[in-house]
């Protein structure tokens, strides 16, 4: 919060911004993960802009609200009431499937709260995402009461001329304000900005040094110079204030933000045109890629196979995205569906590199997308996907997606009363808990701040030691090893380790102290690397030692690449040990 409050006056002093994006999904979750209250952050961040007459702007994921999974209608409605009270003027609502049924309720919620409803067209490039497709979608949203339209070119792969035609087509329906949002990575967006402006676009999203270009927006200075030359009336930039803001952003990055930003994020890459993945997720993709590459090369090392390079894996991933995307119905590649398609492609690549078949692991959230529970897919599913769903007894859904998620605010009111937690000004704490239950609990307990500080310390040490020889990590792991056809359970440790540590490794929780006799029981191994969780939300009851489970029943989750992957029992039986704590990292084949 202190950084936001510090930089706001200099942003205002620049004198060139009509609007500033102040909050939304990423913003609020980052605050919670940082161990701070996002409600305080939004109020203090929006205040100076309001006082200066600059409109404030937030992002809304429609059915998903501010998170990666669907949100009950009562929570969505409270969301708008809270954010307007905190100082947000405009809501940019998008549905990752371009299903207007998910967007239209937000128009009503925005108007009821006194906000401007800006509805988005998620731009992608495919045989079905034509100019006519987008103009027709805009018509439906305008007829439903949208105040503005956003051309959300989140991957920067919209073709400039087509984007100009979309804007011109919308303006023929109604002279409504249009805002263009794009990312620079594939290389189209400067031409796209010029085309949409010539067609009548009113607002352009821009970035600034040192966070422009690459996976971010085109730079403010470049866009202003280009539009001025083209004859448009654009505001001047106070360059003295610009340099203040630039300096402060670099200062914040040097503090700790830079530890979470890959230098590769600033690179332009035309290879992004084919897979169409958005710039907003490329940073996390590159981080995930390192873990995925490590897993693949561990497999290859055990079999004396040549190692794979990161570039080789990246190209395989991009090729697999191109294979997967049409087969799952061409969902626009925007949060969360860009992550779903990318994760599905990565799981396929990893499986095939390890001698397995495609589609072996599909997370529940991805199944919800495939089955229609998140909205109507733009395209048709491949027969192989339909056959897999039917084989596993999964049911397709064509009703209103919101009907799948009943109201929950009363439940969270009761939980807050039991915990003696204040619902907050304008019910903002109630909203935060209902929107982000697990993250909010971690914030309230102090665990989020503790974990964040530990992670920053670790990253700083890794950065400092980047050129130093790397020693084996002093960490114990429980593995199952096959010797001449006989499975053995072993504990592996590196360096000087206390024998007590070895004994403790087999049981990370008190419940794990009850272990099956030697020779009895069967291990459940993690099929991938990630973080172990017994539940994925507050509605689930965690399994415990002594619980009976049936084959195929979900017993836990491994969170990888922002997706919770359900781990199912491979046998009927009784849980005799839980070998790791919730939130602990696990490697592939860990017990």
Language-model-derived ranges and their functions:
Residues 12, 42-50, 104-114, 164-174, ...:
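Surface-exposed amphipathic alpha-helices with a cationic face
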Residues 12-30, 264-272, 276-507:
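Terminal or standalone catalytic/regulatory effector modules within metabolic enzymes
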Residues 93, 149, 200, 223, ...:
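Conserved, mostly hydrophobic/aromatic
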Residues 153, 199-216:
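Glycine-rich phosphate-binding active-site loops on the catalytic face of alpha/beta enzymes
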């Amino acid at each position: 919060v202190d950084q936001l409050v510090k930089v706001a006056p200099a942003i205002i002093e620049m004198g060139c911004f009509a609007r500033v994006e102040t909050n939304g999904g990423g913003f609020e979750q980052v605050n919670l993960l940082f161990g701070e209250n996002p409600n305080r952050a939004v109020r203090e961040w929006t205040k100076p802009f309001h006082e200066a007459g600059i409109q404030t702007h937030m992002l809304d994921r429609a059915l998903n609200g501010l998170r990666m999974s669907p949100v009950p209608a009562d929570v969505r409605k409270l969301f708008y009431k809270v954010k307007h009270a905190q100082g947000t003027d405009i809501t940019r609502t998008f549905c990752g499937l371009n299903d207007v049924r998910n967007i239209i309720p937000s128009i009503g919620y925005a108007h009821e709260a006194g906000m401007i409803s800006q509805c988005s067209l998620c731009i992608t490039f495919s045989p079905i995402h034509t100019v006519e497709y987008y103009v027709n979608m805009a018509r439906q949203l305008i007829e439903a009461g949208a105040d503005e339209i956003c051309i959300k070119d989140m991957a920067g792969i919209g073709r400039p001329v087509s984007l100009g035609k979309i804007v011109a087509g919308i303006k023929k329906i109604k002279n409504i304000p249009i805002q263009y949002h794009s990312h620079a990575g594939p290389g189209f967006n400067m031409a796209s900005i010029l085309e949409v402006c010539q067609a009548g676009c009113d607002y352009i999203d821009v970035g600034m040094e040192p966070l422009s270009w690459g996976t971010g927006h085109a730079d403010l200075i470049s866009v202003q110079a280009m539009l001025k030359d083209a004859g448009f009336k654009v505001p001047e930039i106070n360059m003295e204030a610009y340099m203040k803001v630039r300096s402060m952003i670099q200062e914040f990055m040097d503090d700790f933000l830079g530890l979470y930003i890959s230098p590769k994020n600033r690179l332009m890459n035309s290879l992004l045109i084919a897979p169409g993945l958005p710039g907003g997720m490329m940073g996390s993709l590159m981080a995930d890629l390192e873990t995925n590459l490590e897993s693949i090369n561990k497999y290859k090392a055990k079999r004396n196979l040549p190692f794979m390079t990161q570039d080789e894996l990246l190209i395989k991933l991009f090729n697999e995205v191109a294979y997967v995307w049409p087969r799952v119905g061409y969902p626009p590649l925007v949060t969360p569906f860009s992550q779903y398609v990318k994760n599905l492609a990565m799981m396929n690549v990893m499986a095939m590199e390890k001698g397995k078949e495609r589609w072996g692991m599909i997370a529940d959230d991805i199944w919800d997308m495939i089955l229609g529970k998140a909205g109507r897919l733009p395209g048709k599913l491949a027969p192989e996907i339909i056959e897999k769903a039917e084989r596993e007894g999964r049911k397709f859904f064509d009703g209103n997606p919101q009907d799948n998620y009943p109201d929950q605010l009363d439940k969270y009111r009761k939980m807050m009363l039991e915990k003696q937690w204040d619902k907050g000004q304008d019910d903002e704490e109630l909203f935060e808990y209902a929107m982000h239950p697990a993250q909010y609990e971690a914030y309230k307990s102090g665990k989020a701040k503790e974990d964040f500080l530990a992670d920053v310390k670790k990253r700083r040490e890794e950065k400092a030691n980047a050129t130093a020889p790397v020693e084996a990590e002093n960490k114990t792991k429980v593995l199952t090893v096959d010797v001449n056809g006989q499975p053995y359970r072993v504990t592996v440790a590196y360096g000087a380790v206390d024998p007590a540590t070895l004994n403790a490794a087999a049981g990370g929780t008190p419940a794990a102290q009850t272990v099956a006799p030697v020779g009895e029981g069967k291990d459940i191994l993690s099929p991938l690397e990630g973080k172990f969780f017994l539940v994925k939300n507050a509605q689930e009851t965690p399994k415990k030692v002594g619980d009976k489970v049936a084959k195929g029943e979900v017993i836990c989750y491994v969170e990888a690449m922002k997706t919770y992957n359900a781990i199912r029992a491979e046998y009927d039986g009784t849980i005799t040990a839980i070998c790791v704590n919730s939130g602990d990292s696990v490697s592939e084949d860990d017990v």
